[in-house]
C-alpha cells in the first residue's frame, strides 16, 4: 500500500484541473502543464482535491501509484507557486551573464559556453563583490527545471581537491587531501 499515493492532492483556488482520456491538464496563474497517465491508475477529481487510485495491486501499479500522485502534486505546486534552483560558480575568473534568457558562461575553458534556455525558465544572475556568482533558475515545470540545472552543473562539476566548479547552493562537496610530503 502506497502511503504517498493515498494522500489526496489539494487544488488551490486559481488552479484548474481537467482529465481527458488518459491525460491530466493543469492550468494555473504561472502556466499550463499536462501529464499522460499510463497503467491501471484512476484519477478522481472532486471539488477541490484529486485522489489517485490503482485498479490492481500488481508490482507495476504499486510503483506508479505514488509516482503519479507526486507528479500531479508537483504540477499543481508549480503552476501555483513555481520552483527555484540556485547554482553557484566557485572559481577564480568564473563568470556568468544573462542575455535575455541566454546564459553565457565563462568557466575556465578557452571559449565561452552559451546555453539557450527554454521559454518556461526565467534566469537571474547575481554577481556581488567578494561573493561567488549565483545563477537562479525559476520555472513552473519542476522536471524541466531539474534537467536544465543538472545540465548547467555538468559543464563544470565541482572538483574534489579545491572545490572549484558549478554546484547547487548548500551542496556539500567532499574534498580530498592532496599529495602528502615525505
UniProtKB/Swiss-Prot annotation:
InterPro entries: Ribosomal_uL6-like, Ribosomal_uL6-like_a/b-dom_sf, Ribosomal_uL6_a/b-dom, Ribosomal_uL6_bac-type, Ribosomal_uL6_CS. SUPFAM superfamilies: Ribosomal protein L6 (SSF56053). GO terms for molecular function: rRNA binding; structural constituent of ribosome. Keywords: Ribonucleoprotein, Ribosomal protein, RNA-binding, rRNA-binding. Coiled coil: none annotated. The keyword Kinase does not apply. GO terms for cellular component: cytosolic large ribosomal subunit. GO terms for biological process: cytoplasmic translation. Belongs to the universal ribosomal protein uL6 family. NCBIfam families: L6_bact. Part of the 50S ribosomal subunit. This protein binds to the 23S rRNA, and is important in its secondary structure. It is located near the subunit interface in the base of the L7/L12 stalk, and near the tRNA binding site of the peptidyltransferase center. This is Large ribosomal subunit protein uL6. It comes from Karelsulcia muelleri (strain GWSS). The gene is rplF.
Amino acid at each position: 500500500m502506497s502511503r504517498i499515493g493515498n494522500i489526496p492532492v489539494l487544488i488551490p483556488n486559481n488552479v484548474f484541473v481537467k482529465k481527458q482520456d488518459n491525460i491530466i491538464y493543469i492550468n494555473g496563474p504561472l502556466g499550463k502543464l499536462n501529464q499522460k497517465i499510463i497503467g491501471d491508475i484512476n484519477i478522481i477529481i472532486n471539488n477541490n482535491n484529486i485522489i489517485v487510485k490503482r485498479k490492481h495491486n500488481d508490482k507495476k501499479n504499486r510503483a506508479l501509484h505514488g509516482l503519479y500522485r507526486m507528479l500531479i502534486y508537483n504540477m499543481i505546486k508549480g503552476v501555483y507557486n513555481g520552483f527555484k534552483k540556485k547554482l553557484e560558480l566557485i572559481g577564480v575568473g568564473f563568470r556568468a551573464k544573462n542575455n535575455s534568457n541566454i546564459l553565457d558562461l565563462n568557466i575556465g575553458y578557452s571559449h565561452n559556453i552559451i546555453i539557450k534556455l527554454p521559454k518556461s525558465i526565467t534566469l537571474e544572475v547575481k554577481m556581488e563583490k567578494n561573493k561567488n556568482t549565483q545563477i537562479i533558475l525559476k520555472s513552473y515545470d519542476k522536471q524541466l527545471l531539474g534537467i536544465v540545472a543538472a545540465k548547467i552543473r555538468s559543464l563544470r562539476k565541482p572538483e574534489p581537491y579545491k572545490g572549484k566548479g558549478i554546484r547547487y547552493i548548500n551542496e556539500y562537496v567532499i574534498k580530498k587531501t592532496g599529495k602528502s610530503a615525505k
